[in-house]
Amino acid sequence: MSNLAPEPEFQQAYNELVHSLRDQNSSRLPQILRLLCLSSPPERVIQFRVTWEDDKGNFQVNRGYRVQFNSALGPYKGGLRFHPTVNLSILKFLGFEQTFKNALTGLNMGGGKGGSDFDPKGKSDNEIRRFCYSFMRELSKHIGQFTDVPAGDIGVGGREIGYLFGAYESYKNQFEGVLTGKGITWGGSLIRPEATGYGLVYYVAHMISYASGGKETFAGKRVAISGSGNVAQYAALKVLELGGKVITLSDSKGALIATGEEGFNETDIELIAKLKLDRGYLTQLHAAEDSFKSRFKYLPGERPWCHVDKVDVALPSATQNEVSEQEAKELIASGCKFLAEGSNMGSTQEAINVYEEDRKSRKADGLWYGPAKAANCGGVAVSGLEMAQNSQRLTWTSEQVDKELAGIMERCFWNCLNPAKEYFDIAEGELPSLVAGANIAGYVKVVNAMKAQGDWW
C-alpha cells in the first residue's frame, strides 16, 4: 500500500504514458522503459503560505506552489494557475505533461507548473495586486531566466503577469525575462495570445494533409470547438481563415450550436471576445443579440459534442476531461475524422481508448486523435520564442513569430508521427497513433538527456 496521498489527475497522466510505452512493441524500446520510476517524481516541489490583505484590511491566507518537474532539456517552463481547485495533484499532472510537451517543440525548455488556490474572480485590482506581490515574495527565491520561467494559465492573464513581473523586479532589482506572457512594450512577444489556438489549427492541418495524401485542407470542414476563451477564439479565427466552418462554441454555463450552414463568423468571434473580457457568459449574448438567436441554439449546462449532426473536426479547448467515453462515441457517429486537444488532457482515458480503437478498427476511415501535449504546444512554443527575444533584447514582427510557430508545429507533428511508425507495427491502411508517438518521442528525448547528464547509468 502506498503511503502517498491520492493524486488522481497526476495518476491519469502517468497511466497514459505507461500505457503508450508498454502497450505494443516495447521490445523496440531499450532499457529506458525501466526509468518510468525515475521520470515520474518531480525534481522539486515548493509549497508555501501566501498571506495578503483584502480591501477591508483583513488578512487572508492561501497556498502557493511551484512544481519544478524536470530540467534536463532547459530551464523549468510552465504556467501559473490561480484557481480554488488548484492542488498538488493537478500541478504535478500539468508539470508532467509540460515536460514532454516542451520536449516536442524542439526548444530548450524543461517542464514545470505552479499556482495557488487563490480565486481572482470577485477580487478588486488592488486585492489581486497585493496577492501577486505576496505570492512573488516567496516564488522569486526559486525562479530566474536561467532557472525557471513561469507563464500565465487559468486565472493568470496579462494583468497578473504584470503585477508578478513588477514584484519580481522590485524584490530582485533586475529586469530580466523571468516570466513570459508579458506586455509587448515591456518584453513580451507578438502572437503570444493567439499562439495556442493558432498552433492547434496548424497541427490539425498537418493531420488532415497526411491522412488525405495532401489532397485535403481545412477548406469546407465543419469544426466543433468547445470553450470560448483565448484558445477557442483564436482557433476559430484560424479555422475561418483556412476556409473551415466553426459550428460550436461553449463556456461553463452552456453551448452555442449553429442551426444552419453558415456557422460563426469573425464578427461573432469579436463579440464573444469582448463578452469574455467583461467576464460574461454566452447565454447573455444569445439573449441580447437577434443575430445569435436566429443562427444558433443555446443549450444550458451542455457541452457541444452530443449535439452536432455532422462534424469533421473536433477541437476540445475548454478544460480537462471534457470529452467522455459516450461523447467520443457520439462524435464518431457524427462523422468526426480528426480530434485534437486545445485543452490539457481534454479527453478522459476512456474517450482516448474509444478514439484509438476506432483508428485501429476502421483504419483511414476512423477518427485520428491529436493529444494535448503535441496539439496545444503552440502557447509554450511562443513563450520559448519570447525567451529568445528577451535574451537578444529584440522584438520580432508578428509575421516572424507566426512563421516560427508554424514551423514548430510542423516539426512537432513529425516528431510524433515518425516514432509512432518506428516503434509500433501499423496495419496496412491504418494511421499511426499520435498519442503513442508523442509520449514516446517526448519521453525518449527527456530520459536520454538525463542519461547524458548522469541522472542514470
UniProtKB/Swiss-Prot annotation:
Biological process annotations from GO: glutamate biosynthetic process
CDD domains (alphabetical): NAD_bind_2_Glu_DH
This enzyme's EC code(s): 1.4.1.4
InterPro entries: Aminoacid_DH-like_N_sf, Glu/Leu/Phe/Val/Trp_DH, Glu/Leu/Phe/Val/Trp_DH_C, Glu/Leu/Phe/Val/Trp_DH_dimer, Glu/Leu/Phe/Val_DH_AS, Glu_DH, Glu_Leu_Phe_Val_DH, NAD(P)-bd_dom_sf
Domain of life (superkingdom): Eukaryota
Keyword Oxidoreductase: yes
Catalytic activities: L-glutamate + NADP(+) + H2O = 2-oxoglutarate + NH4(+) + NADPH + H(+)
First-tier enzyme category under EC: oxidoreductase
GO molecular function: glutamate dehydrogenase (NADP+) activity
GO cellular component, one term: cytosol
Keyword Isomerase: no
Family: Belongs to the Glu/Leu/Phe/Val dehydrogenases family.
Complex and partners: Homohexamer.
NCBIfam families in the record: PRK09414.1
PANTHER family according to UniProt: NADP-SPECIFIC GLUTAMATE DEHYDROGENASE 1-RELATED
This protein's name: NADP-specific glutamate dehydrogenase
